[in-house]
């Protein structure tokens, strides 16, 4: 028996597509985007909040892809690990953390070294500098005599030379408590790769695990020398500053709280069956990660995962419906692992497709990235007519925005706009409904107040457009849907469930963005037809 094709709900996440009314240095406003412009003009639209307390982060903290997708998929504001860990340091409860105390108890009698690895940044996206300083204080209280800090500089979620003030702040704290020394220096480009570019990780690993090739200069002198060569924080080559290699019997705390860019270095340091580059396993190591990077890692976890029940993907599966997720490499974990509340395993009926990202050093060299292939995959899935929910992420505005190169970011934005035309054509064939939004801002701000390239995210709101399909009419509105203007990312999942006529579970504390229907039903809106 042949079933009629399903009219899907398609959630399109334009990663890093924020809203800023000023046109100057705004890659989104300056780019040619006829598709988004026409959709914004014709269809119901609003701006939603993606930062700070609206996504479970501290006041003033910019959002990011992990947090954004987690909040979207959960349908509620999820307290973030940044806040959990900061609170534990502030209230002193970190001094009772069992995983950290166990590590200290194992290395203290042997007077072994404690290694602190993480992104030395106040960006708050992968880590926070306050957490490193809190660990130094913990080590002091616990009587650890030798603490080696492996500095990873940012330059992506912060300004490109914010590594220098971060290092100076670390040194001030070291001088204050008389404990700790910075022994290696590496840009996140090497130490925090997440795309299996193992040659980069290998360079960072070798520097951290060997005392050979000590530079001889202070860490600030080394960093300034790289700046003088126009090599900024993200791209600092791994450099040994002082003795203090990771050796058998030592303790290691990896204090990044976001898993995706910490996993590969952790695999190299801990996995017995690691084969991605030649190395001898350093064993035994007492190893703690701040959060759970991967259940397979042979490490202790200081802050266990929060269990989220009745998230969007789970509710769709419970209804016996099929769903499709697609993104290229850079954002694939976000539409799968993070969207599913930190669960690696797909739900029943959830199909995933990973499109490889281009192998380039930085994405200004390929601003189109793999958007065309992502679009082809998603259109094929939509036209199968078997999926009730389709989730797709376009990485371009965010990944190219991170380069700080305006022209490239404009090309990235224009690429995505063209892809939307093809995607909407496929959705129109089945009468589906489309939600177009973003997880956070980025490409709308390419220059900071000092005139320097801005490579980080923003706290700006993002657009949300609802394109109601002929085959997926929202009950009770007669084609005249109105959207709230006070929404946030947590409200997207309840909105999708309302469109699908599925009850919203009590765990979802977000509210549908669709305003209650007015008594008077107005004429249906004439749909935009995209000419290809």
UniProtKB/Swiss-Prot annotation:
Catalytic activity: (2R)-2-phosphoglycerate = (2R)-3-phosphoglycerate
Keyword terms: Glycolysis, Isomerase, Manganese, Metal-binding
GO biological process: glucose catabolic process; glycolytic process
Residues that, per the record, bind substrate: 126, 156-157, 188, 194, 258-261, 331
EC number(s) from the headed UniProt entry: 5.4.2.12
Entry annotation: catalytic residues: 65
Stored Gene3D superfamilies: Alkaline Phosphatase, subunit A, BPG-independent phosphoglycerate mutase, domain B
Cofactor details (free text): Binds 2 manganese ions per subunit.
Reported cofactor(s): Mn(2+)
Protein name in the entry: 2,3-bisphosphoglycerate-independent phosphoglycerate mutase
Organism: Microcystis aeruginosa (strain NIES-843 / IAM M-2473)
Gene that this sequence comes from: gpmI
């Amino acid at each position: 028996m042949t079933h009629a094709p399903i009219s899907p709900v398609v959630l399109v996440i334009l990663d890093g597509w924020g809203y800023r009314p000023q046109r100057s240095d705004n890659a989104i406003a300056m780019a040619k985007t006829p598709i988004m412009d026409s959709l914004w003009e014709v269809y119901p639209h609003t701006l939603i909040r993606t930062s700070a307390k609206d996504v479970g982060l501290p006041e003033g903290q910019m959002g990011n892809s992990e947090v954004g997708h987690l909040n979207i998929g959960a349908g509620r504001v999820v307290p973030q690990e940044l806040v959990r860990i900061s609170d534990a340091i502030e209230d002193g409860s970190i001094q009772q953390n069992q995983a950290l105390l166990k590590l200290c108890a194992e290395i203290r009698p042997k007077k072994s070294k404690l290694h602190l690895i993480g992104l030395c940044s106040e960006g708050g996206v992968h880590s926070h500098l306050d957490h490193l300083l809190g660990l130094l204080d913990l080590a002091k209280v616990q009587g650890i005599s030798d603490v080696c800090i492996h500095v990873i500089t940012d330059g992506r979620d912060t300004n490109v030379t914010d590594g220098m003030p971060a290092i100076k702040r670390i040194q001030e704290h070291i001088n204050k408590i008389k404990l700790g020394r910075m022994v290696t220096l590496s840009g996140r480009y090497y130490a925090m790769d997440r795309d299996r570019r193992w040659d980069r990780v290998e360079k960072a690993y070798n520097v951290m695990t060997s005392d050979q090739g000590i530079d001889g200069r202070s860490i600030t002198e080394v960093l300034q020398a790289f700046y003088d060569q126009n090599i900024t924080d993200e791209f600092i080559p791994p450099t040994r500053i002082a003795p203090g290699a990771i050796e058998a019997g030592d303790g290691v705390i990896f204090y990044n709280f976001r898993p995706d860019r910490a996993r590969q270095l952790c695999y190299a340091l801990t996995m017995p069956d690691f084969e991605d580059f030649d190395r001898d396993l350093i064993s035994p190591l007492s190893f703690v990660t701040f959060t759970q990077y991967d259940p397979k890692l042979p490490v202790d976890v200081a802050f266990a995962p929060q269990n989220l029940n009745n998230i969007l993907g789970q509710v769709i599966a419970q209804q016996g419906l099929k769903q499709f997720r697609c993104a290229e490499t850079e954002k694939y974990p976000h539409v799968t692992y993070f969207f599913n509340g930190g669960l690696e395993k797909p739900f029943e009926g959830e199909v995933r497709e990973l499109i490889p990202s281009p192998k380039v050093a930085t994405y200004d060299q390929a601003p189109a990235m793999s958007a065309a292939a992502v679009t082809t995959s998603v259109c094929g899935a939509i036209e199968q007519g078997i999926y009730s929910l389709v989730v797709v992420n376009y990485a371009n505005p965010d990944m190219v925005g991170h380069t700080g190169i305006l022209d490239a970011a404009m090309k990235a934005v224009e690429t995505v706009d063209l892809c939307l035309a093809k995607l909407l054509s496929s959705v129109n064939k089945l009468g589906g409904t489309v939600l177009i939004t973003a997880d956070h801002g980025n490409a709308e701000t390419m220059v900071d107040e000092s005139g320097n390239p801005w490579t980080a995210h923003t706290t700006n709101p993002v657009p949300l457009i609802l394109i109601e399909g002929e085959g997926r009419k929202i009950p009770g509105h007669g084609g005249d849907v109105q959207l709230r203007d006070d929404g946030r990312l947590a409200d997207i999942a309840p909105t999708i469930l309302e469109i699908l006529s599925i009850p919203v579970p009590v765990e979802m504390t977000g509210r549908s963005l669709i305003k209650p229907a007015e008594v008077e039903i107005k004429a249906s809106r004439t749909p935009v037809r995209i000419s290809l």
